């Protein structure tokens, strides 16, 4: 299996999870007796927290020798978080677990994008090819889960995203190429934060970030309460 196919499989799993969690999580929360306000808090908290968790996880990921190592670990964390949300009762424990699972799931996509871009430049394939596999998977599981929920219990939602997290972890550890994070020795934590600081003070970069954030905020509301 070449690197493009391996990354295509990774994106199928990634978007196979988000194609269920984004539109159907609120349906599961409602079945647990949560109010609309509580559901909004649960869905919004990981996205607001991403202002901090996103950069920190990026710096953390650059501390590994290979790009696939943090992807595998985050897949496992995603499974544990979503699985814990399904097993625990009470708003607070469920909120903490969902925050952990959703934060890990969100970080997996940009980390996979970085790996894919590096491999595409090295091996000569088009980035859109494996990424497109993920888009197809998103639509397919979205429609498939919607049809399944006409007959199945809503708990299948949490079971699905938990299993997807485990599949991502196994696939990353065993099948993704062992692309190094950088040439030579691993960067010290201080040097990794210095690179982050240069981005934060770049006005063009920050303007783009705020623009993308506005788009994502609109998507979040639409997806979160679409079911």
Task: Indicate residue ranges for each PLM-predicted region.
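Helix-loop junctions at membrane interfaces in 12-TM secondary transporters
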Residues: 2-4, 86-98
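Structural signature of the two symmetry-related core transmembrane helices
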Residues: 69-83
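Helix-loop boundary and gating motifs at the non-cytosolic
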Residues: 1-47, 204-212, 216-227
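Cytoplasmic helix-loop-helix junction between adjacent transmembrane helices
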Residues: 98-134
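Helix-to-loop junctions at the C-terminal end of transmembrane segments
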Residues: 51-66, 149-150
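Juxtamembrane intracellular "pre-TM" segments in multi-pass secondary transporters
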Residues: 1, 176-211
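Residue-level signature of mid-helix packing/kink "hotspots" within the transmembrane helices
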Residues: 47-55, 138-139, 143
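Symmetry-related core transmembrane helices of the 12-TM Major Facilitator Superfamily/SLC fold
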Residues: 157-174
């Amino acid at each position: 299996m070449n690197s493009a196919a391996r990354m295509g499989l990774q994106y199928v799993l990634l978007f196979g999870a988000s194609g269920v969690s984004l539109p159907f999580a609120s349906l599961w929360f409602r079945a647990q007796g949560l109010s609309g306000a509580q559901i909004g808090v649960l869905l919004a908290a990981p996205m607001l927290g991403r202002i901090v968790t996103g950069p920190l996880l990026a710096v953390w990921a650059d501390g590994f020798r290979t790009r696939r190592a943090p992807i595998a670990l985050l897949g496992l964390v995603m499974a544990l978080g979503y699985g814990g949300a399904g097993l625990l009762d009470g708003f607070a424990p469920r909120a903490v677990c969902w925050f952990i699972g959703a934060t890990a799931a969100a970080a997996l996509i940009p980390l996979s994008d970085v790996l894919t871009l590096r491999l595409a430049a090295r091996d000569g394939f088009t980035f859109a090819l494996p990424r497109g596999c993920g888009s197809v998977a998103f639509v397919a599981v979205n429609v498939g889960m919607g049809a399944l929920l006409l007959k199945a219990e809503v708990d299948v939602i949490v079971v699905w995203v938990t299993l997807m997290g485990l599949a991502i972890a196994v696939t990353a550890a065993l099948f993704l190429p062992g692309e190094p994070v950088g040439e030579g020795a691993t960067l010290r934590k201080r040097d990794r934060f210095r690179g982050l600081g240069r981005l934060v003070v770049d006005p063009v970069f920050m303007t783009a970030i705020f623009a993308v954030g506005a788009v994502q905020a609109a998507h979040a509301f639409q997806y979160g309460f679409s079911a």
